[in-house]
């Protein structure tokens, strides 16, 4: 089964073609990602209207490129998978309407995919990970620990009660005068800094709840920067290093609790199979090497296999959307042409956080 994937949920326009064999491995035939970073950099963050217009301008061209790179014609595509949420509604509309048009024109089925499920299943695509496993999803819009029991069966253990980790990186970078996107800028600056110079909090550390919180850390960074202003390059490096150290300590503490919860449901003594259970990280922030090293250390200590997909598949991409769509189609599912994009779409809609949900419900 050959699928075309389309991803337009935020500030990357992405298309891909994969070859999927039910019960076997999947092969990525093409994977195209067009970043809008230059469009949004002057504003220090993603501007939804600019993002939607950029998707409109480039998506058709990228669909054709994905087909060309995969040496595939549109008539040879068996199904179309598209991100239907969560994300920026304008961008989602662009992708969903294009997928519907292709479905109508070709008569091929189309499936609306949860963007978070794409991230959740990426390790199955890249490493053939077996269920169940623990997922840490860290991106600009989400910070969650998820127990992945199987396709369509997700248990959200913890989520952020305020800022997502990627958002905290971007806001901290902007505060320090570093360029957008903030994650790589903070990581680069931190390499030259003293992580012990600036005392910063570790939000929720020691608490039994499994949620995350980063707004207090961001506030502490602002206060520290104000106290020593004007900032020199050395000051910026030290604050960046101290911030990153606080983040990795917090991630270690929160994920440690999630691993304990995992082993309560799935005792390691009863685990069967040639490989230990997996701790998987996904999302754009998973590119941070300090976070990866922290998670690798934690996994080794707790008897888990640590899996981080290639960097190109950690950030938003359409190959993961096509793969998630293939999993759903293999279960006999497909979407009707009257479905509407969802700006909020929790992976586990039965597991909403008690704090920080807002009037519109959980952010996902």
Swiss-Prot record:
Enzyme Commission number, as recorded: 2.3.1.234
Catalytic reactions of this protein: L-threonylcarbamoyladenylate + adenosine(37) in tRNA = N(6)-L-threonylcarbamoyladenosine(37) in tRNA + AMP + H(+)
Superkingdom field: Bacteria
Cellular component GO terms held in the UniProt record: cytoplasm
Residues where Fe cation binds: 115, 119, 316
Cofactor: Fe(2+)
Transmembrane segments annotated in the record for this chain: none
Record GO terms (molecular function): iron ion binding; N(6)-L-threonylcarbamoyladenine synthase activity
InterPro entries in the record: ATPase_NBD, Gcp-like_dom, KAE1/TsaD, TsaD
Localization per Swiss-Prot or TrEMBL: Cytoplasm
Alphabetical keyword list: Acyltransferase, Cytoplasm, Iron, Metal-binding, Transferase, tRNA processing
Protein role: Required for the formation of a threonylcarbamoyl group on adenosine at position 37 (t(6)A37) in tRNAs that read codons beginning with adenine. Is involved in the transfer of the threonylcarbamoyl moiety of threonylcarbamoyl-AMP (TC-AMP) to the N6 group of A37, together with TsaE and TsaB. TsaD likely plays a direct catalytic role in this reaction.
UniProt record similarity statement: Belongs to the KAE1 / TsaD family.
Full protein name: tRNA N6-adenosine threonylcarbamoyltransferase
